[in-house]
């Protein structure tokens, strides 16, 4: 079976891209200051696949393009429940940022702020409660959410890890 390239994956899924932040950054060099742009992008298909990427270039368009390719390289799968929530509460950490994610009732919507909200919406999560702690850094908060979502486990995963069937897992 042939390996799927990034272009094949791109055609299969309808990826939605959102630019979370574009910053003007400078680097001091011998001749003065060199100006460039840093773009933070989130790419998702609202079906449980999500990625966060960064792009740096001398112009904004180039930074966004690099950010999209970087985000598509770092895509993770998110297990969603039937109510488009997460299976269990979880915490994620990236740098100084800490994010707490909790499943919520049907119809409650995405209760989150900043880049956390964008990541969760593009992942396809529709009912969740999230809280950002310790840091307001956009990139670290987005990565903390990605860290938390990558740690999520379903009942099937837990049963396989323990080498028992799902019925026994519920009866414990």
Curated annotation (Swiss-Prot):
Q: Where is the S5 DRBM domain?
A: 15-78
PROSITE patterns assigned to the protein according to its UniProt record, in alphabetical order: RIBOSOMAL_S5, S5_DSRBD
Give the subcellular location: Plastid, Chloroplast
Could you tell me which InterPro entries the record lists for this protein? Ribosomal_Su5_D2-typ_SF, Ribosomal_uS5, Ribosomal_uS5_bac-type, Ribosomal_uS5_C, Ribosomal_uS5_N, Ribosomal_uS5_N_CS, Ribsml_uS5_D2-typ_fold_subgr
Q: Keyword set for this entry?
A: Chloroplast, Plastid, Ribonucleoprotein, Ribosomal protein, RNA-binding, rRNA-binding
Molecular function in Gene Ontology: rRNA binding; structural constituent of ribosome
Keyword tRNA processing carried by entry: no
Keyword Ribosomal protein set for record: yes
> Mind listing the GO biological process terms from this record?
translation
Comment field on protein domains: The N-terminal domain interacts with the head of the 30S subunit; the C-terminal domain interacts with the body and contacts protein S4. The interaction surface between S4 and S5 is involved in control of translational fidelity.
Q: Which family does it belong to?
A: Belongs to the universal ribosomal protein uS5 family.
Name-wise, this protein is Small ribosomal subunit protein uS5c
The species this protein belongs to is Gracilaria tenuistipitata var. liui (Red alga)
